[in-house]
Amino acid sequence: IYRQDNWVATMRCPTTKFWGGEIYSKTNRFGRYQAHGTLEIMYDGAMENSGFPKKDNDNSTTKETGGWDWNVEAGSTTVHYTSWKEMMPNKNVTDRFDQYSKTTNFAGALAWKDCGMFGAEFDQDDSWGSQRFTPTNLTFKKSVYAFDGMLISLGSNISASGSYSDDMITATNLF
């Protein structure tokens, strides 16, 4: 976590012991990439200031005029699915699913005075007892350096491979 006068940045990445997202039968069905090296910046004030969908008042009812795309979580590295159906856990609508890293167990941060750094290495596990997603074998290394009100974010060894369609690209999502 890196704080400034009117904003705060949080960085997250799962390990073999810490999961990144919980997917349940009736909630968070598309929450697969909630912590895949995310770098989220939250600003003071309304949630819209931080990129969340805007809510409008229409005849005393509140409705959202936008939506959240779970494929492009802020700062995350993801495989961009072209179908919402493909993004849901395969053949399973009742079990909980937690997203872990398969073998790497490195994600952490250090702070010194008003400076800080975050680093993570990730390799995706697409199963939990049984295969839940079409394997993408997503891997990446990330680091973020925070100083003087700036965030410097670096990524390397970013790759994905699997038997999914060619229009599904792998990308690190900006804001």
Predicted segments with their positions:
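Catalytic and substrate-binding regions of extracellular carbohydrate-active enzymes
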Residues: 1-175
